[in-house]
Amino acid sequence: MADNQEGRPYFPLDEGSIIEGVSDQVIVVVLLSFVAVGSLLYLLLRNDEQNIHPENQDRVRAVREQLQNEQETPPPPRPQFYSDMTCPVCLQQATFPVETNCGHLFCGSCIIAYWRYGSWLGAINCPICRQTVTLIFPLFQATEQEDSQNILREAIGYNRRFSGQPRSLMDRIMDLPTLLRHAFREMFSVGGLFWMFRIRIVLCLLGALFYLVSPLDIIPEAVFGLLGFLDDFFVLFLLLIYISIMYREVVTQRLYR
């Protein structure tokens, strides 16, 4: 009996751990989880900050004055969206709203005027976060009104020019919340995404689910404990990036139909 006990390997538990009684692995996983959740919350909630970036205030002020001068007569009543939403350019209720790939909303006419103002040779930077705007999502249905048709035409023209630009990994991560929100919204809407794209998303989600429940892992939980879940989160994160890339390609291809 004694010989068997002496032959067994001895693994000290929590020796020299940062917090007594708590494994260092648990502490690392908890800290990384807080960082991941905090980053995700920042990406999702930063859209509520509608303050113009200091470097763009002069340009936005000039565009605002230009829009006010062009409106010699009061504009006719137009449908309003997001009753609690104010366009940061014209400081009025958002009408015919559009959303940029970074998740900020503007009046369609305001963001188009901001693009046309000055001598932009490429894609504009968001007036709020200064992220490069490569996609403009109209958030209204086309109507017979001339303003509506003009804004849709300008948005399509802008997307054709800049939606296919190369994107860095950080840009793709910053675009993730907006693209995923639009992708899943169209996925579950009638007449949204075509079936092949929906099938690809479902297969990707099933593949991620099988990987999460599979005992075969790059970092096995049985050996590394809670740290073994890091590869599962990493695979899921890569999957979300891949879905956003696919959706961007679908939006780009749709422009040339």
From Swiss-Prot:
Its main location: endoplasmic reticulum. Gene3D superfamilies: Zinc/RING finger domain, C3HC4 (zinc finger). It catalyses: S-ubiquitinyl-[E2 ubiquitin-conjugating enzyme]-L-cysteine + [acceptor protein]-L-lysine = [E2 ubiquitin-conjugating enzyme]-L-cysteine + N(6)-ubiquitinyl-[acceptor protein]-L-lysine. It is a multi-pass membrane protein. Residues 46-200, 244-257 are cytoplasmic. Keywords: Endoplasmic reticulum, Membrane, Metal-binding, Transferase, Transmembrane, Transmembrane helix, Ubl conjugation pathway, Zinc, Zinc-finger. GO terms for molecular function: ubiquitin protein ligase activity; zinc ion binding. E3 ubiquitin-protein ligase that plays an essential role in stimulus-induced inositol 1,4,5-trisphosphate receptor (ITPR) ubiquitination and degradation via the endoplasmic reticulum-associated degradation (ERAD) pathway. Also involved in ITPR turnover in resting cells. This is E3 ubiquitin-protein ligase RNF170. The lineage of its organism: Eukaryota, Metazoa, Chordata, Craniata, Vertebrata.
